[in-house]
């Protein structure tokens, strides 16, 4: 029954995308089937096949070790404040945000050394050959596995000005369907399962292309002519690369911290108002989370959450992520991952929630896309603005598809035990 419900969820998500497509007749069966096959095959390999699960675990251990090295720098700066066992306990601003700074610097060094470019070219080339997509959208999708929605398009910056509407939309969806490697480390610091975060990041690449090409198929002629490389902004050495990345990471961490202070406080204010008004009618426990849980509970059922209480919790997280952002969603989710949590979620539900939240698909991302892509190619700013809401919908569907597929194989694995 669980398998059938997951398959039904996948079919419904694809059907929604087809209904929202601007040209259903132009949908490429090769691209759609290929992208779905890659997503399902990769999920089966790392979430169901024992050897693949071991490889994913090894990758997660490696990333955890890298994070641990970053903690040395955090401990040096913050001392006892960075030790959760001390009286100060777990301090989000000390344990989570600085990891973003470290990872941002590390990724910049990997870019300087050319390692990231090689990996992106290999993965992007594989996607291009398998799906028949253009070089630009394939490379950007591959880059989104590791970096965020404003950094990934830099890989194909020379293409943006002249790319087709479908290509531009695919790049936007790739950004909304994925997260940045730097913030992934931050989510892991909150207790979100790192294995699922890594898996979701890789699955986001084919998922983003799948829903981008369903909702905005390629009808124009695209060009794969190699643009000229621009090394004018390349750091002079590794130290400058690390410093520049750390500086950018600090700005990101400050933005995340400021955003959380504002939004978490605003949510508390709204909950206070809702509980006060709800108390007049006998609903004193009414909150924004409970409203989201009610609205998105059917969606949680659709993507594979079978327990009623857990479906309500998953609905809360999905609503938070869409209305606010994924960081607030994960912050709420982290409460259910604590040892003293009153509600213990099943492993399948944990996976589904982690995958469903693992993307920048929220309404504030539209402004980020306009600023990022519009800055790289000012002539395309109006196109980005026009396609913004549709890109958020496509990115959300991509995240939900990954969550559904993950739930399917984790459920099969649990049933086989």
From Swiss-Prot:
Database matches in Pfam families: Gate, Nucleos_tra2_C, Nucleos_tra2_N
Any one Gene Ontology cellular component term annotated for this protein: plasma membrane
Superkingdom, natural source: Bacteria
Transmembrane domains' residue ranges: 1-21, 32-52, 96-116, 168-188, 192-212, 261-281, 286-306, 351-371, 392-412
GO BP annotation list: nucleoside transmembrane transport
MF terms (GO), sorted A to Z: nucleoside transmembrane transporter activity; symporter activity
Topology in the lipid bilayer: Multi-pass membrane protein
Annotated signal sequence range: none
Protein's cellular compartments: Cell inner membrane
InterPro entries in UniProt: C_nuclsd_transpt, C_nuclsd_transpt_met_bac, CNT_C_dom, CNT_N_dom, Gate_dom
UniProt keyword annotations, A-Z: Cell inner membrane, Cell membrane, Membrane, Transmembrane, Transmembrane helix, Transport
Recorded family membership: Belongs to the concentrative nucleoside transporter (CNT) (TC 2.A.41) family.
Protein name stated in the entry: Uncharacterized transporter HI_0519
Organism: Haemophilus influenzae (strain ATCC 51907 / DSM 11121 / KW20 / Rd)
């Amino acid at each position: 029954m669980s398998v059938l419900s997951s398959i039904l969820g996948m079919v419904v998500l694809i059907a929604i995308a087809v209904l929202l497509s601007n040209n259903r007749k132009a949908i490429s069966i090769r691209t759609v089937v290929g992208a779905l096959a890659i997503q399902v095959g990769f999920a089966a390999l790392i979430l169901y096949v024992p050897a693949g699960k071991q490889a994913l675990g090894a990758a997660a251990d490696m990333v955890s070790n890298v994070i641990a090295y970053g903690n040395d720098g955090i401990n040096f700066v913050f001392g006892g404040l960075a030790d959760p066992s001390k009286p100060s306990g777990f301090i989000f601003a000390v344990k989570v945000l600085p990891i973003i700074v470290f990872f941002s610097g590390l990724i910049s060094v990997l870019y300087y050394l050319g390692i990231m470019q090689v990996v992106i070219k290999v993965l992007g080339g594989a996607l291009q050959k398998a799906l028949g997509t253009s070089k630009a959208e394939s490379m950007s999708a591959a880059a989104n596995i590791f970096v965020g929605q404003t950094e990934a398009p830099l890989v194909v910056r020379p293409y943006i000005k002249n790319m087709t509407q479908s290509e531009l939309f695919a790049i936007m969806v790739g950004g909304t369907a994925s997260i940045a490697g730097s913030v992934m480390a931050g989510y892991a610091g909150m207790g979100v399962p790192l294995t699922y975060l890594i898996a979701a990041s890789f699955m986001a690449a084919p998922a983003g292309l799948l829903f981008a090409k369903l909702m905005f198929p390629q009808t124009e002629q695209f060009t794969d002519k190699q643009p000229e490389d621009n090394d004018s902004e390349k750091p002079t050495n590794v130290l400058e690369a690390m410093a520049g990345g750390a500086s950018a990471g600090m700005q990101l961490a400050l933005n995340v911290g400021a955003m959380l202070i504002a939004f978490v406080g605003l949510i508390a204010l709204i909950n206070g108002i809702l509980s006060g008004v709800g108390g007049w009618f006998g609903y004193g426990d009414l909150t924004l989370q409970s409203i989201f849980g009610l609205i998105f509970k059917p969606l949680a059922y659709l993507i594979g959450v079978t327990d009623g209480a857990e479906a309500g919790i998953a609905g809360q997280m999905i609503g938070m992520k869409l209305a606010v952002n994924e960081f607030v969603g994960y912050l709420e989710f982290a409460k259910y991952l604590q040892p003293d949590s009153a509600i213990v979620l099943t492993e399948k539900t944990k996976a589904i929630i982690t995958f469903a939240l693992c993307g920048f698909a929220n309404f504030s991302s539209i402004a980020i896309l306009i600023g990022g892509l519009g800055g790289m190619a000012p002539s395309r700013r109006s196109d980005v603005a026009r396609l913004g809401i549709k890109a958020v919908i496509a990115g959300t569907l991509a995240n939900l598809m990954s969550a559904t597929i993950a739930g399917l194989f984790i459920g099969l694995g649990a049933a086989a035990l």
